[in-house]
Amino acid sequence: MASYSWGKRLNRANRYGYDPREDYFRTGVANSESVSLSTGTEKNQTYFSAAAINSNGIVPNNSYDRYNFTFRNTSSFLNDKMRLDVGASYILQEDCNMINQGTYNNPLTGAYLFPRGDDWADIEMYERYDPIDKISKQYWPMGDGSITMQNPYWANYRNLRENRKDRYMLNAALSYDILDWLNVSGRIRIDNSHNTYTEKMYASSNVQLTCLLYTSPSP
């Protein structure tokens, strides 16, 4: 890994003491709440529940949220010969900037390979205004190291990946006892999900990630 090591030789005077655990990572927090309600009579029972999970990851601007809602009702009719069971569930899941595996588009690459002889506080201001183009651009003087490496904070706040998943589940079952030893029944179930994924990369992100790398055709 010598090709990935850069920076001046360290000594007591020029070592800033950068440690990813202390300077980049943060404390992850996960909260979980749930509530349920059930009621009923001899011939009718109803159940409802709701649960939520909200979490913030150990890297900046990383979050995961999930909400679950469940409803179920069972009823009996005609001297308990007919039984109806219906249920419904809804799940909403949202996540922001989940970490990729490997080095590709991964903020941890820059965080781990940052030279210990440089000042981490200097790159915490991850963008600088360019008076020529009149936009703020990524500040990362270390280069990409041939592994699409970027400023970790730029990857966190300017390479945004947001995902939302909605899932609906409905089910119903109806049965009828024709005789003590014979019954007929029918069931139906619907399971539908919809996923929306959005990816935004601001100007000055690595060109290999933004698909702006252009190769001239051969003459």
Set out the residue ranges of the language-model regions.
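Short strand-turn segments of transmembrane beta-barrel domains in outer membranes
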Residues: 6-36, 46-62
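Surface-exposed loop/interface segments of Gram-negative outer-membrane beta-barrel transport/assembly proteins
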Residues: 1-16, 58-62, 68, 72-167, ...
